[in-house]
Amino acid sequence: HRQEARGLEIRLCEDIKSYTKLVPALINFPNAVIISVDDDIIYPIDFVERLYRAYKKDSSKIYFYRGHYILFNEDGSPRPYLECVVRGAKGCDIYNFPTGVSGIIYPPHCYHEDMTNKNLFLKLCPHADDVWFKVMTMLKGTLCEHIPTPHFDSLFIPLDIDETSS
């Protein structure tokens, strides 16, 4: 109750698998800036501040700490998923692929209108929310900018949590 007194709001929502982390917030707060995080990481103390500072610099972009870069075949088609991404997103590019484990800040309306279409994402991409989110932001044309973080692995500390209980 103490956190609720400070402004924390807890809402129950439908379980839509891994999409539950972001989609209900997008539906209920369509004009909000939203930060996505995982519950099995200890984050640096300035984690939110750095994301928000980047957002304030240019509110049209998605900012993230950790991600990949999408690779393509010579004919321009994307490589299969397991070959398609390499860790090492850099700079600002539409082909940067943020990974949610280390935090992402989404500006309002940075995604295609189908982003929250439950029937569509559960049919086309039921187990890969990160792929769905990336495609929806690419369709909108939103750039993704990597926030360089020296000593990343020592700042973002994973907790050893059983996946079935989280």
Each PLM stretch: what is its role?
Residues 22-33:
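Active-site nucleotide-sugar/metal-binding loop of Leloir-type enzymes
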Residues 113, 118-166:
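C-terminal catalytic/acceptor-binding lobe
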Residues 1-12:
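Acidic donor-binding segment of Leloir-type glycosyltransferases
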Residues 25, 42-120:
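Conserved catalytic core of nucleotide-sugar-dependent glycosyltransferases
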Residues 13-21:
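A short, glycine-/small-residue-rich helix N-cap motif at loop->alpha-helix starts
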Residues 31-42:
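Short beta-strand-to-loop acidic/aromatic patch adjacent to the donor-nucleotide binding site
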Residues 31, 58-61, 142:
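Short, high-confidence coil segments that cap the C-terminus of an alpha-helix
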